[in-house]
Amino acid sequence: MLPLPSEQRWQLPAPVQINPELRGSGLCDPLLAVLQRRGYSDGAAIEALLNPAPAPDPRRHFPDLGKAVQRLRQACKQGERLAICGDYDADGMTSTALLVGVLRHLGAQPQAEIPSRLDDGYGLNSGMVERLADDGIRLLVTVDNGVAAREALLRAHELEMDVVVTDHHTLPEELPPLLALLHPACTPDHSPYRGLAGVGLAYVLAMALARNCRSEQGLAMARDLFCIGTIADMAPLQGVNRRWLIDGLPALKRSGLAGLQALQQVAGLDDAPVDAGAVGFQIAPRINAVGRLGDPQLVVDLLTTANDDEALELARQCEQLNRQRRDLCDAIEAEARALVEADGEQRCPFLLLAQSHWHHGVIGIVAARLVDAFGLPVALLASEGDGRLRASVRAPKGFAVDAALQACSDLLERHGGHPAAGGFTVRAEQITALHERLNERADTWLKQQGGLRLVEPEALVQLHELTPQFWQQLQQLEPFGSGHPAPLFWSSRCRISQQRLLRGGHLQLTLRQGDAAMRAIAWRWGSEENLPPEVDVAFQLRLNRWNGTEQLQLELAALRASSGDGLLLERCNRHYWVSRDGDTLVIRNAAGEELRGQPDRTGVCTLSSDHPSGTHPYVQALLQDAAMAMGLAA
C-alpha cells in the first residue's frame, strides 16, 4: 500500500555529472545516473555488473570442501544410504531436492529429512538424529540449517555419525565436532561466495562432487534449483549469485525438471518468460506455501520426479495449498487491520497483535503487509499452547528488528532475525512489558524519522522517455533483487486523467505529461479518496502482460501533489522560492533577487543573463538542487 501524500518525506538524489566513460555501455542517462549513484563510477565497474567474472575454484574458498566431497564420493561408489536434512522454506526445500537429485544420479541412496514447521520447528534436532541412526544412517548432510543445532550435532557425534553441515545462518562461536562445514563466513574476505544462501552452498557441493566423479550430466537441473532457491531466499545478487543467475535464468523456461515445468503450468507461465520476477512472485510462493501449510516432502518429490504426470499432480497440490495460504493471509490481515483501526488516533508506534487462532505459517506474510499499510514495525503472535506465543516481526527500512529483540531478550524465551525481520517466543504474562519496551524503541525511531515515510527516488525520467528501447536497456541490468533492486524512478507534474479503484483495493491511474500517457498501478491502495489533479510519482517500471498483449506500466511506490507554482528550498540555512517558467528555472531569494537558468539533464544551468555570481560553486550547487526539486534534472 502506498503511503498517503501527508505521510511521506521525499528525499531526492543529489545531482550527478555523468562520467563520460560510462557512456560506452550504451545505456541512457537515467540508468547511468542510477548506476553512478550506486557507486558504479567507471566503465570497468559497469562491465563487471553486466558481465560478472566466472566463479573461481571453490576449493580455494571453502577449506572443508575437499573432505565433504571425498566422503560423499565414497557414499556414491558404495550406494550408501544417507540423509539430507533440510528446512521448510523455499531455500531449504530446493537445497534438499538439489542434493537428492545429484546424489541419486551419482549412485548414492539419499533420503530427504525436513522437519514440519508446525510439529517439529526449525532445523536438525536430536530426535531426528537418533531415529536416523536407528535406521542405519551413518552420514548426514544438512542444507540451509545446522550451525544452530548444537545438541543434535553433539548427539550425532556420540553416535559416530559423519556430519557435513552446509548453512548460511550466523555461526556460533563454537561448533561440535563435524566432518566438514561449508559456510560463507569460512571463505576469505571479499570472496564472491560470501552471499550464498543455503541452495548456493548445496550447488557448490554438488558441482564439486559431480566433477570429482566425472559425471556432470545432472548439473543443469541443479542450476535450475539454485536459481529458484536463491531468488526465493532473497540472497544478495552479487558475486557468484549474480554470475550463476545470469547464466541460469534464461534456461529455466526449458528446464529438464518435470516439476519445474509443472509449476510453470499451474502458475500460468506457459507463454511468459521465466525471469527473476516470475520466480519471486509466481513460482517461489507456490513452493513456500507447502512449507507453511503442508508437508515439505511434497516439494522434494515434485522437484526430483522424472514423471510428467506425477509432477503435474504434485504441482496442483502446491497450487491448492497456495490458494489456501492466500485465503488465510487475507482473513488474518482483515482481523489485524480491524484491531489496529479500532485504536484510531491512539495507535501504538509498534503494532503488536495476538490471536490464538492465527496460523504460524502465514503471520510473517501478513506482518509485512501491515508494515506496507501503516509504515510501522509489526509483530503478529499466535498461540503455541502452554501459555506461550510465537511471533513473526517485520519492520520498515531503518528500524532494526534484531537489535530491538536483543534489547528485550530478558523478556523472551527465544528470538532471532536480522534488521528487517525476525521472530520470537514469549510467555503470555510478559507481553504487556514487551509491548511497552518495543513501543519506546519504535517511538524514538519514529521521532528521528519525523513521523514520515522516506521516499528515495534514484533518477528522474519523463513519461515520453519510457519507451520499448528504455525497457530493453533496463533489462540489461537484471536480475534485480536483494543488493541490486530495480531502480526507483520519479517523474514530475503528471496529470491524472483517469482514476479507478480495482477489485482487491488496487488503484489504477492514467497519467499524462505533455503528449505522453502511461498507465500506473498502486497495489493495495485501498482508498477512493480524491487525488491532486497533478502529481509527482515514484515508481518502478514493469511490463504488464494480459490477454496476449504487453504494455509498459508504472508500479507506484509513492505519489505527492506537484509543486505547482513553486516550492520553498532551504540551503545552508537560507530560504529560496523556486518555480518554473516552462523549462526555465526561476529562483528568488528573501530580498527578491532573481536567477533564471536553463538546466541540462544533470542540473547544470546556463543562466539566462550574465550574473556576477553565476559561476560561484554555491550558486551552481543551488541551481542544481533547485533543478532537481522541480523535476528539471536527473
Model-derived regions: residue spans:
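A short acidic, amphipathic alpha-helical/loop segment
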Residues: 151-155, 366, 469
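Histidine/acidic-residue-rich, glycine-tolerant segments that coordinate divalent metal ions
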Residues: 143-197
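Hydrophobic helix-and-loop "lid/oligomerization" segment in the mid-to-C-terminal part
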Residues: 2-5, 13-138, 211-431, 450, ...
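Histidine-centered active-site/metal-ligand motif
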Residues: 168-169, 359, 418, 506
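Acidic, two-metal ion nucleic-acid-processing modules in DNA metabolism proteins
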Residues: 37, 242-337, 372, 393-415, ...
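Conserved acidic residues
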Residues: 138, 179, 536
